[in-house]
Amino acid sequence: MKIIDEIILYENPDPLLVSKQGIFPGIVKLQDNSLLALFTIGQAFDSADQRTYVSKSFDDGRSWSKPKPLHNHIYKNKEESESLKPLLLQNNKLLAIGYAFVRPDSLTPIVNPNTFEILPLNNKISISNDNGESWSMPKNFNVNETPLEISGPCIQLQSGRILGAAPPFHLKESDHSGWISYSDDEGENWSKLSEFYKSKEGHISTWECRLCETNSKIIVIFWAYDNKNKKNLSNHVVISDDAGKTFNTVIDTKIRGQASNIMFYKDDIIFTIHCHRENPTGLILRKVDVRDNKFSILDEINLFSKDGLSSDDTNISKQFGSLKFGQPSILHLNNNELLICFWCIHDNQHIIKTYIVNI
């Protein structure tokens, strides 16, 4: 594997005049082979004015259109800072699914640094019927009355069912689990299908879950964090043979990564990508064989490695607040190319960056 191109999808065009920080990207390929990216722009990493923006590429990710807001709603009372990821349905309808924090004012942080309580969170969905040119105002939905950290894209199974993987969003020392949620009516109604992971003591979080469907399996990868001992664990993987209803024993990948992602390639081969925020740091793409419910690395490449990428891991709140890069994704462009997308800090600005990788 080798990098053949490096592109900035978004950066603040006027950094000396205004603060516009780009974070949390997600990309889908549309029916006409164009690419659509959703990402968040706000004044700061946790600012109350964060909104979802839309950008398109018509040349396999080599250039991108000027981003435009997904919606122009003006909040009269409390603002909502949002993050949404795209999903293309089989009927070519587009969904943007994620969450928004309800902000009482512009200076109250998402996480209370003393109590670790988080602000109220609403799960959100928006719909586009015109290839992403216009979108409905994001509306609330709920899964068992539980706010979920839906930070990654949902998937639509071959059966038509939509699945999402996410944990209930809280920072307590226990009562953590990873949920599979589903919708059988294109996102109108949602329910909990299963728990893909829960530790015996409930002290391990399943942050930034991502999932994919292979020919016969559902695979979920997640950032495992031990809240009791306040430390990161290796990325973990779970596999389902019955469309997400039940999951086999968890697989410790032995990869010391945090935010990660996963893409089905062919047969029993997947690609994974991992943010390594503990030394040695980097953004590592891996080709993996998952035959017989194992995790065998076939090849890997470090795409993004430089000094100063590590995070403060004193506790999970400080870790969230000191991130330098994250939320990587993998998109298969053609037989030999993958598009890797993530956010990172460059010249004191949060930007959206991509790599084209020949595999």
List each model region and its residues:
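Asp-box/BNR beta-propeller blade signature and adjacent active/binding-site loops
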Residues: 1-359
